[in-house]
Amino acid sequence: YMRCGSFPYIASMSDKEEKADTYIEGIYNTVIIKDIEERQARKEKTTDKRKITDITLLKNIAKYLASVIGSPVSVKSIADYIASSGRKVSQNTVSDYIEALTEAFIFYSAERYDVYGKQLLKQNAKYYIVDLGLRRYLLSKRNYDLGYSLENIVYLELLRRGFMVNVGKIGNQEVDFIVKKGDLIE
């Protein structure tokens, strides 16, 4: 589960890792290319949002988010990272591309919650990936980090149980999850 992911077909495979990569690649390319492009075509008719036209940029942002799951990330830090590789991109473009990845359910965003002010903040969200096998595929099997992988699993389980999940800080201490269901905040 933690290495190859949780897509149902993978559980029935022998030689899981080799076959899983091919299977996950097919899912990823289908979602990235077909689903996001179709969603953008529908959206183009009803909104003035920027159309996702650069699939390479979209994939680079997906790889970056996969490499930092469970860490606070800003749109500016992603734009700066991409600029460091020689490509200039605006923060608005990065924001639109992240939105496309979350609308396609490849990533989920956990917004920061001000514990004292009891309100959502729009900076330094954490992103979690839909499946750890997909993360392994995107990162070419490097840097298996148990802590962030477990945090990703807990996040997805909290969502599955119907909680709204945020992240926060109290003083200098990070709060991994602030969960809300109905009027109850834990």
What residues fall within each predicted segment?
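Interdomain hinge/linker elements that couple catalytic modules in large macromolecular machines
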Residues: Y1-L156, M164-V165, K169-G171
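Short beta-strand or tight-loop elements
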Residues: R161, Q173-V175
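Short, surface-exposed charged micro-motifs
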Residues: K126, D176-I178
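Active-site beta-strand-loop-beta-strand hairpin of nuclease catalytic cores
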Residues: V179-E186
